[in-house]
Curated annotation (Swiss-Prot):
Its cofactor is Mn(2+). GO terms for molecular function: inorganic diphosphate phosphatase activity; manganese ion binding. It catalyses: diphosphate + H2O = 2 phosphate + H(+). It is an enzyme of class 3 (hydrolase). InterPro entries: DDH_dom (IPR001667), DHH_sf (IPR038763), DHHA2 (IPR004097), DHHA2_dom_sf (IPR038222), Mn-dep_inorganic_PyrPase (IPR022934). The keyword Hydrolase applies. Mn(2+) 1 binds at residues 9, 13, 75. This is Probable manganese-dependent inorganic pyrophosphatase. The lineage of its organism: Bacteria, Bacillati, Bacillota, Bacilli, Bacillales. It is found in: Cytoplasm. It holds the Pfam family DHH. The keyword Hydrolase applies. Mn(2+) 2 binds at residues 15, 75, 97, 149. It comes from Listeria monocytogenes serotype 4b (strain F2365). Belongs to the PPase class C family.
Amino acid sequence: MTKTLVFGHKNPDTDTICSAISYAELKKAQGADIEAVRLGELNSETAFVLDYFQVTAPRLVQTVANEVSEVALVDHNERQQSVDDIDDVTVTAVVDHHRIANFETSDPLYYRAEPVGCTTTILLKMFRENEVEVSKTVAGLMLSAIISDTLLFQSPTCTQEDKVAAQKLAQIADVDIQSYGMEMLKAGADVSKKTVAELLLDAKEFNMNDNKVEIAQINVVDVNDVLSRRAEVEALMTQNIVDKGLDLYLFVITNILTNDSVGIAIGSKTAVVEEAYGVKFVENQAPLKGVVSRKKQVVPILTDTFAK
């Protein structure tokens, strides 16, 4: 039997890690030889989740073609967000809830993408469609992913399907959604011990009308906890622009209590962000009122503005 590795995007978040583990459990129950791995370090929120449910973190890998010939992707499809040697392996399956871009295969594959708030919402359907029982531990991980991606149902990406799935998973995991959810989000929003690199850990690269754009996001309970370190943050953002040849680096600092954000933008195309949101960046900083979702409120808007 051919072994498969399953993983989410680089700079993994809670959905990416929990989806990879959950997908692997589903496929193992069906007799597959599969292992969940990760493409980067865990953030503090995900570390809290794995510790809470006593789950070992997936193994960290830099490349995959040296181990397997087939892989499955969760929570992403764009090649620049995936493992560096993605072109050297065959993608046999994708389960995702993002836009489809920069993705093609030479062979048919299983591809499932739905416009929901979280990948594990889709995975719960797949467990049920295949009549595979969701364990208490996996239910906890899947619930955590939904809470994370929807900001405890406050994000505009959240759908009724996500809410229903979360209720079902909470029953299996035997946790209270509100109390556990706030504890989890606050664990991720504590930036007091984070390095500057960790502040920018949740970053994704996009191609927008032939422009290289990186968008990082962090959830906090007080944006000043990050803005007080703005000089360090901007220095690292600038270095990333040079190292990666980026046209724009946008850092979205989201207050999970007010559901607003502040943006820091650096690069030759910062004017695109100003046009997209009708704001003016002062010393690289501008308010992004009501913006909490990179997937729904940042990527599509910037993509459209770059295309003008």
